[in-house]
From Swiss-Prot:
GO terms for biological process: translation. The keyword Ribonucleoprotein applies. One of its GO terms (cellular component) is ribosome. One of its GO terms (molecular function) is rRNA binding. This is Small ribosomal subunit protein uS8. Part of the 30S ribosomal subunit. Contacts proteins S5 and S12. Keywords: Ribonucleoprotein, Ribosomal protein, RNA-binding, rRNA-binding. It comes from Arthrobacter sp. (strain FB24). One of the primary rRNA binding proteins, it binds directly to 16S rRNA central domain where it helps coordinate assembly of the platform of the 30S subunit. Belongs to the universal ribosomal protein uS8 family. InterPro entries: Ribosomal_uS8, Ribosomal_uS8_sf.
Amino acid sequence: MTMTDPVADMLTRLRNANSAYHDTVTMPYSKLKARVADILKAEGYIASWKEEDAEVGKKLTLELKFGPNRERSIAGVRRISKPGLRVYAKSTNLPHVLGGLGVAILSTSSGLLTDKQAGKKGVGGEVLAYVW
């Protein structure tokens, strides 16, 4: 069966693994998921990610990040633009997650960017997810 929304699947796997205090989470690889993982690593929400060969296709493995007393680095994840209802934001009206404490991930003509990066470049796009 084909997957309708691979980004939502990635975020759900990440949310579930984070809630269960797993150290790693594995999912099918795609370039879009790898770019989302790049943003999560750059913003400090995950420790690292790697691409692995599997028997069929490739796998993306995310290493989750926890504090010294196993505090979660990700408090919440929400998918915003869905296949049934796309959500777009102009460069003048970019979302701010929790007053700037979280990150909005946008798909723009310049690739995947955070809300802060998109504001600096002056581009808008599809709002994929919020992470805080």
